[in-house]
Amino acid sequence: IHHVKTYTLDVLKYKNIFDYIITKTWLSRSRDEKSIPWHIHACAHISFVYYLNTPPKSHKLKFMNPHHKNSLWLGNKEGKYDHLKMIEEHNEINAETFFLHPPEGHIALFPSTLHHSTESIDGFVGERLAIVGDITCVLKKEYLQFSTGFISPQHWKIYQG
């Protein structure tokens, strides 16, 4: 949770008003050249990937820029027809996607509603292993007066259906 607090407080610049609940985790295993399609984690606030094993040419983690604020024309995507595009060099300012090649032992933290996927790389051999999970931010007890934000499940009343 230390990294999540650092991300929330120092990177995103939120106030220190949250407790953090890991709501689910799973093991991600990639053994072939199949990619994971674009998706979000709608039931969480922060998602994480902790890379246990990253062989050479293992999948890259891709993120989609949902705003395209610096795109002058639609259709200037990165891809196999780059020679037909108007952009000299894709970077974090003009690209609609960006990616990471996370090293072993790296943890990636990102907003759960940020579209993301994985993309395989030709020649990948081996198995990429990662622990993946979702975190929900809940208001600390002394900050329940905020009109938005989740309250801790300890204050919930659950009715069995």
PLM regions with names:
Residues 1-34, 38-41:
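Signature of the catalytic double-stranded beta-helix
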Residues 1-4, 151-161:
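Surface/interface-facing alpha-helical segments and adjacent flexible terminal/loop regions used
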Residues 7, 14, 20, 50-51, ...:
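Sequence-level detector for tyrosine residue identity
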Residues 15, 20-21, 54-56, 124:
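A generic structural signal for short, non-catalytic loop/turn and secondary-structure boundary residues
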Residues 30-109, 119, 126-127, 131, ...:
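Catalytic core of non-heme Fe(II) oxygenases with the double-stranded beta-helix
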Residues 116:
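Glycine-rich nucleotide phosphate-binding loop and flanking beta-alpha elements
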